Amino acid sequence: MDSNTVSSFQDILMRMSKMQLGSSSEDLNGMITQFESLKLYRDSLGEAVMRIGDLHSLQNRNGKWREQLSQKFEEIRWLIEEVRHRLKITENSFEQITFMQALQLLLEVEQEIRTFSFQLI
C-alpha cells in the first residue's frame, strides 16, 4: 500500500467533510462513507495479496468475494460519475481541486483493486 495514497485518501476525505454544499450535504456524506469503505476494501485486498496463498483464506472468509469485488467496481464507477458531475457543476476552485484529486485517486484505486484481484484469481 502506497503511503502517498493513504495520505491522499485522508486529505481528500478531510477536505470533502469540510465542504458545505447546501442541500446535497447528505449526498456528500454518503460519498465520503463510500470512499472510506472503498479504501478499507482496497487495503484488505492488498494485505491478502501480500500474504502468499491467502486466496483460500479469503474464499473461506467470504465465499462470495467475486460478487463483492463486482459490487466494489460498481461503487467505484458510481463514485467516479458522481465526482465528475460535481466537478462540472461546482464553481468554487477549492471544491474543483478537491474533486479533481478525488477523481484521480479513484482511478488509481480502481487500478490497484484490479491488479490485486488479478493476483488473487
Swiss-Prot record:
The keyword Transport applies. It is found in: Virion; Host nucleus. A motif (Nuclear export signal) lies at residues 12-21, 85-94. Gene3D superfamilies: 1.10.287.230, S15/NS1, RNA-binding. SUPFAM superfamilies: Nonstructural protein ns2, Nep, M1-binding domain. Keywords: Host nucleus, Host-virus interaction, Transport, Virion. It holds the Pfam family Flu_NS2. Its main location: virion. GO terms for biological process: exit of virus from host cell nucleus through nuclear pore. The keyword Transport applies. GO terms for cellular component: host cell nucleus; virion component. Belongs to the influenza viruses NEP family. Interacts with protein M1. May interact with host nucleoporin RAB/HRB and exportin XPO1/CRM1. Average number present in a viral particle is estimated to be 130-200 molecules. Mediates the nuclear export of encapsidated genomic RNAs (ribonucleoproteins, RNPs). Acts as an adapter between viral RNPs complexes and the nuclear export machinery of the cell. Possesses no intrinsic RNA-binding activity, but includes a C-terminal M1-binding domain. This domain is believed to allow recognition of RNPs bound to the protein M1. This is Nuclear export protein. The lineage of its organism: Viruses, Riboviria, Orthornavirae, Negarnaviricota, Polyploviricotina.
